[in-house]
Amino acid sequence: MDVGSCNNHYFYDVDMKEDFYRCIAPSEDIWKKFELVPGFPLSPGGCPGGGGTDWGAELMDLGWESPMKLTGLSSVVLLRDCMWSGFSTRERLEKVIHERLTTASPRATNPQKPVADHENSEPGVNSIEQNANPLVVPTPVPEKVPNSSGSESTSDSEDDEIDVVTIEKRKSYGGRQPVTITVRADPTATKLFHISIHQQQHNYAARLPPEPNSMSPQPNFHSPIKEEPGEVTSPPALQQCSSPMPGSPLASGSSDSEDIVKKKNHNYLERKRRNDLRSRFLALREEVPSLTRSTKTPKVVVLSKATEFLKGLVIQEQQLTAEKFKLWSRHQQLLRRISHLKGR
């Protein structure tokens, strides 16, 4: 099985002018195509012992040219680490690598020439290869990171360390189901691959921003009529002083308020007048001797009795005035008689 051709259709684009990260998310059909069971790849850095360093150095000395000139990643193990496969044990991986070594022995006579040509044609390959070299150099992995979803392939030997490939399947409403892939490796390699794959999965489920027209407020054509700057509205108690323009809604409202104020004032004055009249009738009833003992007397009776009593008082006053005049004349007669008697 050609691993380079397997990775050719997923991670990289043959055209150098195209985007480095433009690719299509893998689906479940890729396992059926290569007759592989999905599992986690074997990390070249997690192989214990000194044998891993030997075959890793041989792979670096071979200098195989990757089918994708854009990447410059000439290590088959690195490509195998990027594109997970069904080789879950070290023995199977070494077997396939030895088969590749035997087939590539004619090309091993001049190992540095393809790399030199590639470096002359591509100035940015050296920096990418330096970032990818930590994946080829075997380094011990402290512990195995648990996977969030997917299936973990069982290894035949307990000493083998396994990198973690996280496969998170999202529910999509269309026919395609994008898969998010995270390659756990050296921090530089994680920065190289994980971020690029995350960028290609970014805009699949993005929503369109809301239209600016929907957020703009609608003009209100039914706004109430505003008052004129020169017009001053008075409080309800002083509505009589204001004189709004006739025929306007404000004038009708002010006239209604004026009617209400006038009605309130009229009711107050009427109640006050009735109270005063009642108190006067009560006082008049107390002055009439014939009505002092009656608690409930009609006003007409009180007025008639009071009138009669008043007329009687007037007659009595006249009689007293006439009697007084008589007494005064009698007094004058007596004074004149006294003086006449003294003159004798």
Curated annotation (Swiss-Prot):
This protein's UniProt keywords: DNA-binding, Nucleus, Phosphoprotein
Instruction: Name the Gene Ontology molecular function terms of this record.
Output: DNA-binding transcription factor activity, RNA polymerase II-specific; protein dimerization activity; RNA polymerase II cis-regulatory region sequence-specific DNA binding
Q: Where is this region: Leucine-zipper?
A: 313-341
Q: Does the keyword Glycosyltransferase apply?
A: no
Pfam families given in the database record: HLH (PF00010), Myc_N (PF01056)
* Subunit structure, as described in the record: Efficient DNA binding requires dimerization with another bHLH protein. Binds DNA as a heterodimer with MAX.
List the protein's name.
Answer: Protein L-Myc-1-A
- Source organism: Xenopus laevis
